[in-house]
A protein has these predicted regions:
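Surface-exposed, low-hydrophobicity beta-strand/loop segments enriched in small/polar/acidic residues
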Residues: 1-148
Length: 148
């Protein structure tokens, strides 16, 4: 018996659609995208992140390697020293809604909604010293989703 192999057909990835065009929406695509039929699009909701020490800190350490994580939300993250110690310290990390999302330790990379490393300075941190990480709004445009 002869075996026939059928090639890919247009829109074969569509299994079903809701009535009244509920499955379709017009979006603006980020420039430079090479979109493939059937691939998933994701909205760019968060842009870059920047970090800064808050004026009035006693400790003179810095915040470095700041970036927005995959689950970041736009807004200002608060990083507050809760356990000071000589040449180290523990900081509570709060998201823009005021929810503690983790604890950062001086000298160790923090990874989560936002990513950063706190460095020790010549003067140790005291309770209440703080940093902020501001995650900017994204473009709101869409690009091909890449989970990697």
């Amino acid at each position: 018996m002869t075996e026939l192999i059928e090639g890919q057909n247009k829109a074969e990835f569509i299994v079903t659609e809701a009535n009244g065009s509920l499955s379709r929406e017009s979006v603006t695509v980020l420039s430079g995208q090479n979109l493939q039929p059937g691939h998933i699009l994701g909205k760019v909701s968060v842009g870059t992140a920047t970090g800064a020490a808050v004026s009035g800190n006693t400790g003179n350490g810095t915040i470095t390697d700041v970036s927005a994580g995959d689950t970041a939300r736009a807004g200002i993250y608060q990083i507050v020293c809760i356990e000071p110690a000589t040449n180290i310290g523990t900081f509570a990390v709060e998201n823009p809604n005021g929810v503690i999302i983790g604890h950062a330790v001086v000298g160790a990379a923090f990874a989560g909604e936002v990513n950063f490393t706190l460095t020790d300075g010549a003067t140790d941190f005291v309770a209440g010293d703080r940093f902020t990480v501001t995650a900017a709004e994204g473009s709101g445009k869409y690009k091909e989703y890449n989970p990697a």
